[in-house]
C-alpha cells in the first residue's frame, strides 16, 4: 500500500488488506492512495487482483465517510464524496467530483462519470453518465446534477448547454450516434 502525504485515517479503518475475491490466491497486488484524502471510521479499502488491474487506486482530495467499502480493482478519481455506508463492488470506476448518497450500492464493473450524483440508497447496476443524477427505487435517471455543477463553479451558460445536451441525449429518443451528431 502506497499512501501520499496529507491523508487522514480515523478509527478502525481497514486499508490495503487482501481482497475477499474468490479468484485471489495471494498474488502481489497493491493499493495506491493519492494526497489529502479523509478516511472516516470503519471504512474498508482492498488491494487489487492480478486478474484485473492488480491495484486499487484512490486519487486526491476524496472524503470517504464512515462504513464505506471500496473493493478490489476500483479506480476512484479526485474530489469525490462517498457518504456513509456506500459500497463499491470490484472493478468500479468513479470519475472526479462524484457524490454518492448514503447507502449507495454499486455493482461490479460500473462506471460513474465526473460530477454525477446518486440519491440515498441508490442501487447502481449500470453506468451513470457524467453530470447526471440518479435516484429512487429502482434507481433511474433523475436529470442533470445542476446543484452539484453550480457548487463546483460551472457558469450558467455551461449548465444551460449541458441541459440542452442532456435533453437531446436522454429525452429525444435518438440513437447514441444520432444524439452525438445533434449535440455537436
Predicted regions and their residues:
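Terminal amphipathic alpha-helical/low-complexity segments used for targeting or macromolecular assembly
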Residues: 6, 12, 23-24, 28-30, ...
Amino acid at each position: 500500500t502506497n499512501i501520499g502525504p496529507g491523508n487522514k485515517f480515523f478509527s478502525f479503518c481497514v486499508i490495503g488488506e487482501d481482497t475477499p475475491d474468490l479468484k485471489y490466491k495471494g498474488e502481489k497486488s497493491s493499493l495506491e492512495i493519492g494526497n489529502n484524502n479523509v478516511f472516516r471510521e470503519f471504512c474498508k479499502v482492498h488491494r487489487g487482483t492480478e486478474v484485473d488491474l492488480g491495484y486499487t487506486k484512490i486519487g486526491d482530495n476524496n472524503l470517504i465517510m464512515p462504513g464505506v467499502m471500496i473493493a478490489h480493482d476500483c479506480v476512484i478519481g479526485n474530489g469525490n464524496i462517498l457518504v456513509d455506508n456506500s459500497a463499491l463492488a470490484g472493478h468500479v470506476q468513479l470519475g472526479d467530483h462524484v457524490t454518492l448518497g448514503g447507502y449507495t450500492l454499486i455493482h461490479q464493473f460500473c462506471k460513474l462519470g465526473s460530477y454525477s450524483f446518486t440519491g440515498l440508497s441508490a442501487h447502481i447496476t449500470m453506468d451513470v453518465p457524467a453530470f447526471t443524477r440518479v435516484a429512487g427505487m429502482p434507481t433511474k435517471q433523475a436529470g442533470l446534477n445542476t446543484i452539484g455543477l453550480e457548487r463546483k463553479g460551472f457558469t450558467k451558460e455551461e449548465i444551460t448547454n449541458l441541459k440542452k445536451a442532456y435533453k437531446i441525449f436522454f429525452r429525444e429518443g435518438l440513437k447514441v450516434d444520432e444524439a452525438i451528431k445533434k449535440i455537436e
